[in-house]
């Protein structure tokens, strides 16, 4: 196995992760920076709140497909290890994009793309959990947080079967939980914004 090529591919995937749907659309279409509006997060939920359903959906799809693409590239050349390295670096590139002064999104849509490629059925179950929570509570962040916790638990169980796939569940779940720490604090204190409300 040529680890040098894996490192190079991982770096490429980091820069693919730098492509932010919300920042690109807000700058190209609205001549604004979404990080100055709403929750100031460069993600699909904030894009939905600030610019509406179409932009929110477009943002989600861009961020989702870059994760899917990087997972595919990693798997094609390096199997499960490639998914771990390339998928993880893509998500890190989304969260900490050097092209945008290291101020990106929280990585949910991109992580979803990575994990959906790795294990479609299991991730669809996580998606159903997310949707149920959001529809019942109107809190997107709560759905994301519970999805991340579920991913970590699943990863801890699955790591015995496939170390690399189990590990990426754990790492992406922990990273996303860390990025949601302010949301968690607001949820605890009843100050988090519900979907459809600013």
UniProtKB/Swiss-Prot annotation:
Pathway of this protein? Lipid metabolism; phospholipid metabolism
Q: Which GO CC terms are listed, alphabetically?
A: plasma membrane
| The EC number(s) this enzyme carries | 2.3.1.275
The organism's superkingdom is given as: Bacteria
Q: What compartments host this protein?
A: Cell membrane
Q: Which UniProt keywords apply?
A: Cell membrane, Lipid biosynthesis, Lipid metabolism, Membrane, Phospholipid biosynthesis, Phospholipid metabolism, Transferase, Transmembrane, Transmembrane helix
In alphabetical order, the GO MF annotations are: acyl-phosphate glycerol-3-phosphate acyltransferase activity
State the Gene Ontology BP annotations. Answer: phospholipid biosynthetic process
Q: Give membrane topology per the record.
A: Multi-pass membrane protein
Report which reactions are catalysed by this protein: an acyl phosphate + sn-glycerol 3-phosphate = a 1-acyl-sn-glycero-3-phosphate + phosphate
Its job: Catalyzes the transfer of an acyl group from acyl-phosphate (acyl-PO(4)) to glycerol-3-phosphate (G3P) to form lysophosphatidic acid (LPA). This enzyme utilizes acyl-phosphate as fatty acyl donor, but not acyl-CoA or acyl-ACP.
Q: Please describe the quaternary structure of this protein.
A: Probably interacts with PlsX.
Q: What is this protein called?
A: Glycerol-3-phosphate acyltransferase
Q: Which organism is it from?
A: Finegoldia magna (strain ATCC 29328 / DSM 20472 / WAL 2508) (Peptostreptococcus magnus)
Gene (UniProt) = plsY
């Amino acid at each position: 196995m040529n680890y040098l090529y894996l490192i190079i591919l991982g770096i490429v995937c980091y820069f693919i992760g730098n492509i932010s749907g919300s920042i690109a659309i807000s700058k190209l279409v609205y001549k604004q920076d979404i990080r100055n509006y709403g929750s100031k997060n460069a993600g699909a939920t904030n894009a939905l709140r600030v610019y509406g359903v179409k932009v929110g959906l477009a943002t989600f799809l861009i961020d989702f497909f870059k994760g899917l693409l990087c997972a595919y590239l990693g798997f094609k050349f390096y199997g499960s290890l490639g998914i771990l390295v390339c998928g993880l670096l893509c998500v890190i590139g989304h969260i900490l994009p050097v092209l945008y002064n290291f101020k990106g999104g929280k990585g949910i849509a991109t992580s979803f793309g990575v994990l959906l490629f790795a294990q479609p059925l299991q991730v669809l179950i996580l998606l159903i959990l997310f949707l149920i929570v959001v529809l019942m509570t109107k809190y997107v962040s709560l759905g994301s947080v519970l999805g991340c916790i579920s991913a970590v638990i699943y990863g801890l169980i699955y790591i015995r079967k496939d170390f690399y796939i189990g590990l990426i569940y754990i790492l992406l779940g922990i990273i996303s939980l860390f990025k949601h720490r302010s949301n968690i604090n607001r949820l605890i204190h009843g100050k988090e914004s519900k979907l459809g409300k600013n």
